[in-house]
């Protein structure tokens, strides 16, 4: 007998984590990987393969709805004001649920945000790139224990569809000290990249990650800036060994949209171009530094206009 159409499993779903339901723009992917190692023999070659670890990854690009609750999950305070050396998973397990419209609920019992989405600031782009969550063993569990990593259960889908309100799409302007960037070629991209170090035990494999640092950058191709303005913004004339932690914050904002702040920013790249169809200003790159007064590295804020 051939395969029946009704036996093929497919269709969309949504992700719930930290009390927030995420609707995706282009699909949800869950990868559950078992790391392995070969057992070699000089006489016979590979004798066996053994399992060494287990890690899950759930990735999606959020649809773009803006809300304070969503921002609190995607850009948590422990990244805004980096708690270097902290446990990423913490002492209490935070479940992540992928619920399909077809009526199946996959629950990863211990999950954490491990890749922030890029923030895309443009009137013709939704606000977020791809986010990634990592799933590990539940706290104190061995891989062989019951309910140690995930559960699967039938459950009627009841999470609805993404709301039409709060969708992004705003014109953003940047301010950096006396430098004003009122318009760009194709908007701004802000990247927040946590540096995470895995923590493993001999009996369980990876059970946590430690926050080792956070890198925050922003880039845009500005319009209307002169050669002298771009060169003056670069630290070219700073002394060798001089600190590049600037006195000014980079603030990118739009009425009705987000306000993104890179603390104590500096311009690190700013090429100039000459050519028949080339724009003079190339892509400006900024990087953030921790503000020693309040410990903050960046901020992402949204005020609901309603």
Where do the PLM segments sit?
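Signature of extracytoplasmic/envelope-associated structural regions
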Residues: 1-306
